[in-house]
Regions:
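Alpha-helical structural signal in soluble globular domains
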Residues: 30, 119, 176, 215, ...
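Active-site loop segments of alpha/beta catalytic cores
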Residues: 132, 151-264, 278, 282, ...
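Short, well-ordered coil/turn segments that N-cap beta-strands
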Residues: 31-35, 125-130, 180-184, 222-227, ...
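Catalytic-face loop-and-helix region of soluble metabolic enzyme cores
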Residues: 246-353
Length: 354
Protein backbone atom coordinates (compact mmCIF):
# COMPACT_ATOMS: atom_id res chain seq x y z
CA UNK A 1 0.00 0.00 0.00
CA UNK A 2 1.51 3.32 -1.07
CA UNK A 3 -1.44 5.70 -0.91
CA UNK A 4 -0.72 9.33 -0.02
CA UNK A 5 -3.87 10.77 1.55
CA UNK A 6 -2.25 14.07 2.66
CA UNK A 7 -4.97 15.46 4.95
CA UNK A 8 -7.93 13.81 3.24
CA UNK A 9 -11.06 14.83 5.19
CA UNK A 10 -13.45 12.16 6.45
CA UNK A 11 -15.58 11.39 9.52
CA UNK A 12 -16.98 8.84 11.94
CA UNK A 13 -20.44 7.53 11.06
CA UNK A 14 -22.95 8.92 13.54
CA UNK A 15 -24.79 12.21 12.91
CA UNK A 16 -27.54 13.97 14.93
CA UNK A 17 -29.70 15.01 11.98
CA UNK A 18 -33.35 14.03 11.51
CA UNK A 19 -33.33 14.69 7.75
CA UNK A 20 -31.42 11.96 5.93
CA UNK A 21 -31.14 14.11 2.81
CA UNK A 22 -29.44 16.86 4.79
CA UNK A 23 -27.07 14.34 6.38
CA UNK A 24 -26.06 13.17 2.88
CA UNK A 25 -25.63 16.81 1.77
CA UNK A 26 -23.26 17.46 4.68
CA UNK A 27 -21.30 14.28 3.99
CA UNK A 28 -20.86 14.97 0.28
CA UNK A 29 -20.16 18.70 0.60
CA UNK A 30 -17.80 18.77 3.59
CA UNK A 31 -15.78 15.55 3.25
CA UNK A 32 -13.20 14.46 0.66
CA UNK A 33 -14.09 10.93 1.70
CA UNK A 34 -17.86 10.96 2.36
CA UNK A 35 -19.55 8.59 4.78
CA UNK A 36 -23.00 7.05 4.99
CA UNK A 37 -24.65 8.57 8.06
CA UNK A 38 -25.76 6.55 11.05
CA UNK A 39 -28.88 8.38 12.27
CA UNK A 40 -30.02 7.44 15.77
CA UNK A 41 -32.95 9.83 15.31
CA UNK A 42 -34.66 6.97 13.49
CA UNK A 43 -34.69 4.84 16.61
CA UNK A 44 -33.30 1.75 18.23
CA UNK A 45 -32.38 -0.05 15.02
CA UNK A 46 -29.77 2.61 14.15
CA UNK A 47 -28.07 2.27 17.53
CA UNK A 48 -24.39 1.34 17.26
CA UNK A 49 -24.55 -2.41 17.87
CA UNK A 50 -28.16 -3.15 16.93
CA UNK A 51 -27.64 -1.66 13.46
CA UNK A 52 -25.29 -4.55 12.67
CA UNK A 53 -27.32 -7.37 14.25
CA UNK A 54 -29.47 -8.50 11.31
CA UNK A 55 -28.89 -12.10 10.34
CA UNK A 56 -26.89 -13.04 13.43
CA UNK A 57 -28.37 -16.14 15.10
CA UNK A 58 -30.20 -15.68 18.39
CA UNK A 59 -30.22 -11.85 18.46
CA UNK A 60 -33.27 -10.60 20.38
CA UNK A 61 -34.33 -6.94 20.16
CA UNK A 62 -36.56 -5.71 22.99
CA UNK A 63 -38.32 -2.66 21.57
CA UNK A 64 -40.06 -1.91 24.89
CA UNK A 65 -36.88 -1.85 26.99
CA UNK A 66 -34.85 -0.38 24.15
CA UNK A 67 -32.07 -2.93 24.11
CA UNK A 68 -30.79 -6.10 22.49
CA UNK A 69 -29.43 -9.33 23.92
CA UNK A 70 -28.68 -12.84 22.71
CA UNK A 71 -30.51 -16.01 23.68
CA UNK A 72 -27.88 -18.70 24.26
CA UNK A 73 -30.27 -21.23 25.83
CA UNK A 74 -31.24 -24.56 24.32
CA UNK A 75 -29.99 -26.09 21.10
CA UNK A 76 -28.83 -23.56 18.53
CA UNK A 77 -26.80 -26.00 16.42
CA UNK A 78 -29.15 -25.83 13.42
CA UNK A 79 -29.11 -22.02 13.40
CA UNK A 80 -25.32 -21.99 13.63
CA UNK A 81 -25.09 -24.58 10.84
CA UNK A 82 -27.12 -22.31 8.55
CA UNK A 83 -24.89 -19.38 9.49
CA UNK A 84 -21.62 -21.22 8.87
CA UNK A 85 -22.89 -22.59 5.57
CA UNK A 86 -23.62 -19.02 4.39
CA UNK A 87 -20.25 -17.89 5.72
CA UNK A 88 -18.26 -20.60 3.94
CA UNK A 89 -20.22 -20.14 0.71
CA UNK A 90 -19.22 -16.47 0.72
CA UNK A 91 -15.82 -16.44 2.39
CA UNK A 92 -13.99 -19.67 1.52
CA UNK A 93 -10.64 -18.49 0.12
CA UNK A 94 -10.63 -21.16 -2.59
CA UNK A 95 -14.26 -21.53 -3.62
CA UNK A 96 -16.13 -18.66 -1.95
CA UNK A 97 -18.57 -16.65 -4.08
CA UNK A 98 -17.95 -13.45 -2.14
CA UNK A 99 -21.71 -12.98 -1.83
CA UNK A 100 -22.17 -11.63 1.70
CA UNK A 101 -25.86 -10.75 1.35
CA UNK A 102 -26.69 -13.13 4.21
CA UNK A 103 -25.34 -10.34 6.43
CA UNK A 104 -26.92 -7.44 4.53
CA UNK A 105 -28.08 -4.36 6.43
CA UNK A 106 -31.65 -3.50 5.42
CA UNK A 107 -33.08 -0.02 4.99
CA UNK A 108 -35.05 -0.56 8.20
CA UNK A 109 -31.71 -0.63 10.04
CA UNK A 110 -29.91 2.04 7.99
CA UNK A 111 -31.61 4.92 6.25
CA UNK A 112 -28.17 6.36 5.51
CA UNK A 113 -26.77 3.49 3.43
CA UNK A 114 -29.69 3.48 1.03
CA UNK A 115 -30.06 7.26 0.81
CA UNK A 116 -26.36 7.60 -0.06
CA UNK A 117 -26.55 4.79 -2.61
CA UNK A 118 -29.56 6.43 -4.27
CA UNK A 119 -27.79 9.81 -4.40
CA UNK A 120 -24.60 8.36 -5.86
CA UNK A 121 -26.53 6.36 -8.44
CA UNK A 122 -28.32 9.54 -9.52
CA UNK A 123 -25.04 11.48 -9.68
CA UNK A 124 -23.70 8.99 -12.19
CA UNK A 125 -19.99 9.45 -11.48
CA UNK A 126 -17.48 7.70 -9.24
CA UNK A 127 -16.16 9.40 -6.13
CA UNK A 128 -12.40 9.24 -5.51
CA UNK A 129 -13.04 8.10 -1.92
CA UNK A 130 -15.89 6.72 0.17
CA UNK A 131 -16.02 5.44 3.76
CA UNK A 132 -18.29 2.79 5.29
CA UNK A 133 -18.23 1.54 8.87
CA UNK A 134 -19.04 -1.42 11.09
CA UNK A 135 -19.04 -1.86 14.85
CA UNK A 136 -15.95 -3.87 15.66
CA UNK A 137 -16.25 -7.44 16.95
CA UNK A 138 -14.62 -6.66 20.29
CA UNK A 139 -16.93 -3.76 21.10
CA UNK A 140 -19.95 -5.72 19.83
CA UNK A 141 -19.18 -8.86 21.83
CA UNK A 142 -18.15 -7.09 25.03
CA UNK A 143 -21.15 -4.72 24.99
CA UNK A 144 -23.92 -7.18 24.19
CA UNK A 145 -24.92 -9.83 26.69
CA UNK A 146 -26.77 -13.13 26.95
CA UNK A 147 -29.87 -13.91 29.03
CA UNK A 148 -27.67 -13.94 32.17
CA UNK A 149 -26.17 -10.52 31.39
CA UNK A 150 -22.83 -12.12 30.57
CA UNK A 151 -20.93 -10.49 27.72
CA UNK A 152 -20.93 -12.61 24.56
CA UNK A 153 -17.16 -12.28 24.26
CA UNK A 154 -16.83 -14.91 26.99
CA UNK A 155 -18.90 -17.43 25.00
CA UNK A 156 -16.42 -18.69 22.40
CA UNK A 157 -19.09 -20.08 20.07
CA UNK A 158 -21.01 -16.81 19.91
CA UNK A 159 -17.81 -14.77 19.78
CA UNK A 160 -16.73 -16.58 16.63
CA UNK A 161 -20.12 -16.01 14.99
CA UNK A 162 -19.95 -12.30 15.83
CA UNK A 163 -16.44 -11.91 14.42
CA UNK A 164 -17.46 -13.62 11.19
CA UNK A 165 -20.72 -11.67 11.00
CA UNK A 166 -18.88 -8.34 11.26
CA UNK A 167 -16.41 -9.52 8.60
CA UNK A 168 -19.28 -10.28 6.21
CA UNK A 169 -21.03 -6.98 6.96
CA UNK A 170 -17.83 -5.12 6.06
CA UNK A 171 -17.58 -6.97 2.76
CA UNK A 172 -21.27 -6.45 1.97
CA UNK A 173 -20.90 -2.69 2.40
CA UNK A 174 -17.75 -2.49 0.29
CA UNK A 175 -19.40 -4.51 -2.47
CA UNK A 176 -22.51 -2.31 -2.33
CA UNK A 177 -20.55 0.91 -2.83
CA UNK A 178 -17.82 -0.36 -5.18
CA UNK A 179 -19.66 0.90 -8.29
CA UNK A 180 -19.61 4.43 -6.86
CA UNK A 181 -16.05 4.93 -5.57
CA UNK A 182 -12.47 4.36 -6.69
CA UNK A 183 -11.24 3.75 -3.13
CA UNK A 184 -13.29 2.49 -0.19
CA UNK A 185 -12.29 2.76 3.44
CA UNK A 186 -14.09 0.52 5.93
CA UNK A 187 -13.76 1.52 9.56
CA UNK A 188 -14.06 -1.13 12.24
CA UNK A 189 -15.13 0.99 15.19
CA UNK A 190 -13.74 -0.24 18.52
CA UNK A 191 -14.57 2.32 21.23
CA UNK A 192 -14.33 -0.33 23.93
CA UNK A 193 -10.58 -0.64 23.36
CA UNK A 194 -10.21 2.55 25.40
CA UNK A 195 -10.99 0.32 28.41
CA UNK A 196 -8.64 -2.49 27.35
CA UNK A 197 -6.39 -3.49 30.23
CA UNK A 198 -8.73 -2.08 32.88
CA UNK A 199 -9.98 -4.21 35.77
CA UNK A 200 -13.33 -4.63 33.99
CA UNK A 201 -11.72 -6.49 31.09
CA UNK A 202 -8.69 -8.01 32.80
CA UNK A 203 -9.58 -11.47 31.43
CA UNK A 204 -9.70 -10.26 27.82
CA UNK A 205 -6.49 -11.46 26.20
CA UNK A 206 -4.48 -9.20 23.92
CA UNK A 207 -3.81 -12.04 21.50
CA UNK A 208 -7.54 -12.76 21.17
CA UNK A 209 -8.28 -9.07 20.55
CA UNK A 210 -5.60 -8.86 17.85
CA UNK A 211 -6.82 -12.08 16.20
CA UNK A 212 -10.48 -10.96 16.20
CA UNK A 213 -9.66 -7.59 14.70
CA UNK A 214 -7.28 -9.11 12.16
CA UNK A 215 -9.97 -11.50 10.90
CA UNK A 216 -12.21 -8.54 10.05
CA UNK A 217 -9.31 -6.56 8.55
CA UNK A 218 -8.49 -9.47 6.25
CA UNK A 219 -12.13 -9.60 5.12
CA UNK A 220 -12.00 -5.90 4.20
CA UNK A 221 -8.90 -6.59 2.12
CA UNK A 222 -10.68 -9.36 0.18
CA UNK A 223 -12.69 -6.72 -1.67
CA UNK A 224 -9.83 -4.25 -2.03
CA UNK A 225 -10.91 -2.03 0.85
CA UNK A 226 -8.68 -0.17 3.28
CA UNK A 227 -9.36 -1.19 6.87
CA UNK A 228 -9.33 1.45 9.58
CA UNK A 229 -10.04 1.27 13.28
CA UNK A 230 -11.46 4.15 15.30
CA UNK A 231 -11.04 4.33 19.07
CA UNK A 232 -12.14 7.60 20.64
CA UNK A 233 -10.22 7.27 23.90
CA UNK A 234 -6.69 6.25 24.78
CA UNK A 235 -5.67 2.64 24.17
CA UNK A 236 -2.68 0.41 23.50
CA UNK A 237 -2.27 1.61 19.90
CA UNK A 238 0.14 -1.21 19.05
CA UNK A 239 -2.85 -3.59 19.15
CA UNK A 240 -4.22 -1.99 15.98
CA UNK A 241 -0.86 -2.14 14.23
CA UNK A 242 -0.38 -5.79 15.19
CA UNK A 243 -3.88 -6.53 13.86
CA UNK A 244 -2.81 -5.21 10.45
CA UNK A 245 -5.14 -2.22 10.13
CA UNK A 246 -4.34 0.22 7.33
CA UNK A 247 -5.62 3.29 9.20
CA UNK A 248 -5.30 4.10 12.90
CA UNK A 249 -7.88 6.72 13.93
CA UNK A 250 -7.62 8.44 17.30
CA UNK A 251 -8.76 11.53 19.21
CA UNK A 252 -5.95 13.97 18.37
CA UNK A 253 -7.63 16.80 20.28
CA UNK A 254 -7.59 15.18 23.75
CA UNK A 255 -5.18 12.25 23.31
CA UNK A 256 -2.96 13.34 20.42
CA UNK A 257 0.29 12.74 22.29
CA UNK A 258 -0.52 9.13 23.11
CA UNK A 259 0.44 7.68 19.73
CA UNK A 260 4.03 8.83 20.31
CA UNK A 261 4.14 6.51 23.33
CA UNK A 262 4.00 3.68 20.77
CA UNK A 263 6.64 5.14 18.47
CA UNK A 264 8.03 1.78 17.35
CA UNK A 265 4.57 0.57 16.33
CA UNK A 266 3.80 3.87 14.58
CA UNK A 267 7.09 3.67 12.70
CA UNK A 268 6.26 0.12 11.61
CA UNK A 269 2.72 1.16 10.62
CA UNK A 270 3.79 4.18 8.57
CA UNK A 271 6.74 2.26 7.13
CA UNK A 272 4.44 -0.29 5.54
CA UNK A 273 2.28 2.47 4.07
CA UNK A 274 -0.24 2.71 6.90
CA UNK A 275 -2.19 5.89 7.50
CA UNK A 276 -2.93 7.92 10.62
CA UNK A 277 -6.37 9.54 10.86
CA UNK A 278 -5.97 12.49 13.20
CA UNK A 279 -9.27 13.13 15.00
CA UNK A 280 -8.34 16.71 15.73
CA UNK A 281 -11.83 18.23 15.45
CA UNK A 282 -13.45 17.89 18.91
CA UNK A 283 -16.94 16.40 19.15
CA UNK A 284 -17.59 18.01 22.53
CA UNK A 285 -18.79 21.52 23.44
CA UNK A 286 -15.13 22.54 23.01
CA UNK A 287 -15.88 22.85 19.28
CA UNK A 288 -17.66 26.14 20.01
CA UNK A 289 -14.39 27.86 20.91
CA UNK A 290 -12.30 26.40 18.09
CA UNK A 291 -11.25 27.98 14.81
CA UNK A 292 -9.49 26.56 11.78
CA UNK A 293 -6.29 28.24 13.00
CA UNK A 294 -6.49 26.80 16.54
CA UNK A 295 -7.16 23.30 15.23
CA UNK A 296 -4.34 23.47 12.68
CA UNK A 297 -2.03 24.55 15.52
CA UNK A 298 -3.15 21.58 17.62
CA UNK A 299 -2.58 19.25 14.68
CA UNK A 300 0.92 20.64 14.10
CA UNK A 301 1.71 20.18 17.79
CA UNK A 302 0.72 16.51 17.92
CA UNK A 303 2.33 15.71 14.55
CA UNK A 304 5.57 17.33 15.77
CA UNK A 305 5.32 15.32 18.96
CA UNK A 306 5.27 12.11 16.91
CA UNK A 307 8.02 13.35 14.58
CA UNK A 308 10.21 14.00 17.64
CA UNK A 309 10.41 10.22 18.15
CA UNK A 310 12.39 9.93 14.91
CA UNK A 311 9.59 9.50 12.38
CA UNK A 312 9.82 11.69 9.29
CA UNK A 313 7.41 14.64 9.46
CA UNK A 314 7.01 14.39 5.68
CA UNK A 315 5.85 10.78 6.02
CA UNK A 316 3.37 11.79 8.71
CA UNK A 317 2.03 14.56 6.43
CA UNK A 318 1.72 12.39 3.33
CA UNK A 319 -0.04 9.60 5.23
CA UNK A 320 -2.48 11.78 7.20
CA UNK A 321 -6.27 11.86 7.23
CA UNK A 322 -8.35 14.46 9.10
CA UNK A 323 -11.47 13.43 11.05
CA UNK A 324 -13.55 14.50 14.03
CA UNK A 325 -12.46 12.98 17.33
CA UNK A 326 -15.58 10.78 17.44
CA UNK A 327 -19.06 10.54 15.95
CA UNK A 328 -21.34 13.57 16.18
CA UNK A 329 -24.55 11.63 16.88
CA UNK A 330 -25.02 12.92 20.43
CA UNK A 331 -24.16 16.56 19.65
CA UNK A 332 -26.45 19.54 19.17
CA UNK A 333 -27.07 19.93 15.45
CA UNK A 334 -25.41 23.37 15.24
CA UNK A 335 -22.29 22.00 16.92
CA UNK A 336 -22.23 19.03 14.55
CA UNK A 337 -22.53 21.37 11.55
CA UNK A 338 -19.46 23.22 12.82
CA UNK A 339 -17.55 19.96 13.27
CA UNK A 340 -18.01 19.07 9.59
CA UNK A 341 -17.20 22.61 8.48
CA UNK A 342 -13.97 22.46 10.52
CA UNK A 343 -13.02 19.13 8.95
CA UNK A 344 -13.30 20.81 5.56
CA UNK A 345 -11.43 23.96 6.60
CA UNK A 346 -8.58 22.19 8.42
CA UNK A 347 -8.17 19.68 5.58
CA UNK A 348 -8.05 22.51 3.02
CA UNK A 349 -5.66 24.64 5.08
CA UNK A 350 -3.21 21.80 5.71
CA UNK A 351 -3.20 20.76 2.05
CA UNK A 352 -2.48 24.36 1.10
CA UNK A 353 0.36 24.62 3.61
CA UNK A 354 2.04 21.38 2.55
Amino acid sequence: MAIKTKFLGSAIGSMPFSDVGHAIDVSLSKLDCPIWPQLSFFGLKEQMEIQYSEGIPRAVIDEVKGRMSFDTTGDYSDEFAVFYDAYMTAMDPDSGTGDCSAMAISEEFSHGIYALEKRLKANGKKLPWLKVQTTGPISFALTLVDENKRALWYNEEFRDVIIKSMAMKCRWQIQKFKPYAENIICFIDEPILSAFGSSTYVSVSRDEVVAALNEVVEAVHMDGGLAGTHCCGNTEWSILVDAGVDIVNFDAFEFGETVAMYADSMKEHLGRGGLLAWGVIPTSPAIREQTCESLCAQLEKVMDNLAATGISKQTIIEQAIITPSCGTGSMAQDDAEKVFEMVKQVSTAMKKKY
